[in-house]
Design a protein with these regions (language model features):
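Extracellular/periplasmic metallocenter environments
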Residues: 199-200
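Surface-exposed loops/turns
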Residues: 195-196
């Protein structure tokens, strides 16, 4: 998990002073949405003598900055088994993530009979001029990750010998930060996230010219929404805007409550690992409930007739969840107290208590430098691994 630098948004009395850049609700509504299909992102192209990173899916090639990949729940078309959860193998090859048998939200390496929830990899266009690059290769560099948890791109099998793990990119302390590319590179890999929520991944493509000079594009950032509801096709008002437009009042009298509990009556594969998040309003207010996990956006839920509900895989680790309710009409708005969530346990808070602020966390973890380093002294160790 990240070591967050947490910024507290303005109190109710000074909310109007917040700049739009701090808004956290529906932040990717209106972008190109990559989901339930085969996706190459980032895919490296060569245009105007520079690398350009795009997302290729469904006949589209938008810039990665204009794209959000949504990793929701997905199930095999063959046997209805879930395709969004990955359990660490018993052979211990991924104990750098957690103990064998621990389960995480994951965009799958392989899908069966469909591309649900998403078939996500990265690649390079066939016109990449690798003949101009030293050794005929370029590299996709993962420069930073900003989100509620860690990320890892890999392939693996639960073989007894433990020889099938291929780590590609990631944010763990010993994760690779660069993956080689040749013209036409195309990967099928798992992309694991230790918690649900909104992740911002910053990439670049780099190579060495035959003269040894660095060739690299400016860093570009893309978004992956893990869990939550699908981002909307159209752009929507931000949380800050909705909150400023909603009414102040006596939230305690309105009778708002937020509850998290293990999902009852599991129906689909993986449901036994889900948590049901429920919001209720005794005043039957309608509006939008924004959920944040460790200060990062998780999802927006429509509140109808005083109720909203969502089943989510919260991951194996504790987290802190906060809700912000922006009702329609003259019903009072509410910011919940941060709710400490423990996997497999029930948690509850209500509007008899309210927070003056909601938390917004942003702590990009810098993984790789963008500046060249000149080695001026001895004593360095180089590690190479297959």
């Amino acid at each position: 998990m990240a070591s967050p630098r947490t910024r507290f948004l303005a109190t109710l009395s000074t909310l109007a002073l917040i700049t739009p850049a701090t808004a956290v609700a529906g932040p990717d509504d209106g972008k190109h949405i990559a989901t339930n299909t085969h996706v190459d992102s980032p895919k490296s192209f060569w245009e105007n003598n520079d690398f350009v990173l795009k997302s290729e899916f469904g006949g589209q090639e938008p810039p990665i900055a204009d794209t959000v990949a949504w990793v929701g729940k997905g199930y095999s078309a063959t046997d209805n088994s879930n395709q969004y959860l990955y359990t660490l193998p018993a052979n211990g090859t991924q104990d750098y993530i957690g103990a064998p048998g621990t389960t995480y939200y994951t965009a799958p390496h392989q899908v069966s009979g469909n591309t649900s929830p998403i078939w996500l990899g990265f690649g390079a266009d066939t016109s990449l001029p690798t003949d101009k690059f030293r050794d005929g290769v370029a590299f996709l560099d993962l420069l930073s990750v900003d989100g509620p948890g860690e990320v890892e791109l890999f392939t693996n099998k639960d073989d007894e010998a433990g020889t099938q793990l291929h780590r590609m990119l990631g944010s763990f302390p010993d994760s690779p930060h660069s993956a080689y590319l040749v013209a036409g590179t195309h990967t099928h890999n798992s992309t694991l996230f230790t918690k649900p929520g909104r992740y911002r991944l910053t990439y670049r493509t780099s190579a060495r010219g035959r003269d040894g000079q660095l060739i690299a594009n400016e860093p570009q950032t893309t978004t992956i929404q893990v869990g939550g509801q699908k981002p909307k096709e159209e752009k929507t008002p931000s949380l800050k805007e909705r909150f400023a437009q909603s009414a102040a009042g006596n939230a305690a009298a309105a009778g708002y409550s937020l509850r998290m509990a293990p999902k009852s009556n599991p129906e689909k594969d993986g449901d036994d690992k889900l948590t049901t998040i429920s919001f209720d309003a005794k005043n039957k207010a309608q509006g939008t409930l924004t959920l944040l996990i460790d200060g990062y956006f998780l999802t927006d839920l429509p509140v109808k007739d005083g109720h909203a509900q969502w089943d989510e895989y919260m991951g194996p680790d504790p987290s802190q969840v906060q809700a912000v309710f922006t009702p329609e009409g003259d019903a009072p708005r509410w910011i919940s107290q941060p709710l400490d969530f423990q996997p497999g346990k029930s948690s509850h808070t209500d509007s008899s208590a309210a927070a003056d602020t909601w938390q917004e966390t942003s702590q990009p973890r810098q993984l790789a430098p963008t500046q060249e380093t000149e080695l001026k002294e001895l004593g360095y160790t180089i590690r190479m691994r297959k």
